[in-house]
Amino acid sequence: MTNSTQTKHGILPTPPVPEDLPSAVFTENARQVLIRRYVRRGDDGKPAETVEEMFWRVAYHIAAVEETWGTDVMARAREFYHLLSSKAFFPNSPTFTGAGTLLGQLAACFVLPIADDMGRASDGIFQTLRDAALIQQTGGGNGFSFSRLRPKGSLVKSSAGQATGPVGFLRVYDNAFGEIAQGGTRRGANMAVLRVDHPDIEDFVACKTNENQITNFNISVGITDAFMRAVEARVSAPAAGK
């Protein structure tokens, strides 16, 4: 691929794959998975690079960072390419999709705060949703704690209405992420956490009972020391606010 063609497909200038590098050895099925998920595509939707060119793009641009410390970039890139082509080491998915691109986002996991605010705060519910959507477009996944949100049905003084609650906003997030393809290749991975002492914890634990609901999240309960002491003492652990 020439530099002009690379730029057209959102790829930073990358030297050609050295001719003496070996081809990657994969089954045809594995090769098709790599092509389907990770190679860059042109405007027509067809692959704009081979699997070997994709590996070299990743290897070269990861190695290029070490030029700052006087490393021989081409030699280091060759080392990395051999690790990839021999299946000795694979990076995370965002590295395959993001290395050597104009954005260059390589991180797989982000943890975002959610404040009990509809959007005026920098970490308000919908500001965080916006940030998370942008992260997922670059191939990253997100983790959230919904523990600061007030319980469902609580009074909202500013509007004299009732609070939606953590599970309600979890559904809002889930619906939004259902429309976003992570990195243009797959749906985003998300983790929702709620503290065990939140008044809505039982609804939260049961929110995925219907397997057709909240399909873009895994959920986890945040366990506290007080809860574990109550378990050991075989006594009730009251929820916060009750």
PLM feature segments, named:
Residues 1-242:
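Extended catalytic cores of very large enzyme megasubunits
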